[in-house]
């Protein structure tokens, strides 16, 4: 179901949600961190979703063990490098990795700006080694409040040329986007693109707010847009993309089953929607699974899956020349 003549992208992929279970085990041993299990087989149920979680916040706790072993900036650099290696193994030509440095720094009080620098270094080295093209999206973790997000923003601004976009993720219901207007004003002043997690836990009003007040060019998840016809019209007309994450939305109980996922409806409505993983390490899936298993189960036809693949590049935070070069590179293979 993947068109090998087109670039394969993953533009909604959390770096800190893709820490290998084996790496968690190794870093735990290296830094003498007590883990809930001592073998890979027994650790996996603690760090991967085995059964669907009741809600988004419960799902997010599965990420915690991955960041608890980030006891040094070298560990952060390692997982960034491995994220690029994983992208290469998955056959991705282009990936946008998003990460929350405050979340990654929290367990061991690492310097937030140092985490940003370590991630940049690890990704740069990975791209050089594996030939994958990547850009970084900075996440502000709304769950930790406005001041913590301000600290993350300052760390990103210190490396503004290596950051492509700003995102807001975490507890959408408890910390609405309206709390972060000044943060996004500064992001736009820095010349960054804007993508926002919205319409995952909260309703369509959260998506409207992300677009109108935060300046979102893309929406992460956005499943609740299905409840507002005017919003779907607006998304299609303005070419505001929806970064769909099929398996993730089932695992967080945002959508009851794949057959009920709105991605097919979004594509039929002319919305620029793409297929992405979200937190592949925690979910136990990869982009190939999303295209070949999840998308057909969500009712997408072969042509709709191809359109979603095209949309992934069209939505990417690349300029027209970068997109053209990537298309030509893949077509020439």
Swiss-Prot record:
The record marks 221 as: Important for catalytic activity. Keywords: Hydrolase, Metal-binding, Nucleotide metabolism, Zinc. InterPro entries: A/AMP_deam_AS, A_deaminase, A_deaminase_dom, Ado/ade_deaminase, Metal_Hydrolase. GO terms for biological process: adenosine catabolic process; hypoxanthine salvage; inosine biosynthetic process; nucleotide metabolic process; purine ribonucleoside monophosphate biosynthetic process. It comes from the Bacteria. GO terms for molecular function: 2'-deoxyadenosine deaminase activity; adenosine deaminase activity; zinc ion binding. Its EC number is 3.5.4.4. Binds 1 zinc ion per subunit. Substrate binds at residues 14, 16, 170, 279. Belongs to the metallo-dependent hydrolases superfamily. Adenosine and AMP deaminases family. Adenosine deaminase subfamily. Catalyzes the hydrolytic deamination of adenosine and 2-deoxyadenosine. This is Adenosine deaminase. It comes from Escherichia coli O157:H7. The gene is add.
């Amino acid at each position: 179901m993947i068109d090998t003549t087109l670039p394969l992208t993953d533009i909604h992929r959390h770096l800190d949600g893709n820490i290998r279970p084996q790496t968690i085990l190794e870093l735990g041993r290296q830094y003498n961190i007590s883990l809930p299990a001592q073998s890979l087989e027994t650790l996996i149920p603690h760090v991967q979703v085995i059964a669907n979680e009741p809600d988004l916040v419960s799902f997010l706790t599965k990420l915690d063990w991955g960041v608890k072993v980030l006891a040094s900036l070298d560990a952060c650099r390692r997982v960034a490098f491995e994220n690029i290696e994983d992208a290469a193994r998955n056959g991705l030509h282009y990936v946008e990795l998003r990460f929350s440095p405050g979340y990654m720094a929290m367990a061991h009080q690492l310097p937030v700006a140092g985490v940003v620098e370590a991630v940049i270094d690890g990704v740069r080295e990975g791209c050089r080694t594996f030939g994958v093209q990547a850009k970084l999206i900075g996440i502000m973790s709304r769950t930790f409040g406005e001041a913590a997000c301000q600290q993350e923003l300052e760390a990103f601004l210190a490396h503004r040329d290596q950051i492509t976009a700003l995102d807001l993720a975490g507890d959408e219901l408890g910390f609405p986007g309206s709390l972060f207007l000044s943060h996004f004003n500064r992001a736009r002043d820095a010349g960054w693109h804007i993508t926002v997690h919205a319409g995952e836990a909260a309703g369509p009003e959260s998506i409207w707010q992300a677009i109108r007040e935060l300046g979102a060019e893309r929406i992460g998840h956005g499943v609740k847009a299905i409840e507002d016809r005017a919003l779907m019209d607006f998304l299609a007309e303005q070419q505001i993309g929806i970064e769909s994450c099929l398996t993730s939305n089932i695992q967080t109980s945002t959508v009851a089953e794949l057959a009920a996922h709105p991605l097919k409806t979004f594509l039929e409505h002319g919305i620029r929607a793409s297929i992405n993983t979200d937190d592949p390490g925690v979910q136990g899936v990869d982009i190939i699974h999303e295209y070949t298993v999840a998308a057909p189960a969500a009712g997408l036809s072969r042509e709709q899956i191809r359109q979603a693949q095209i949309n992934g590049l069209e939505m990417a935070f690349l300029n027209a020349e970068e997109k053209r070069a990537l298309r030509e590179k893949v077509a020439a293979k």
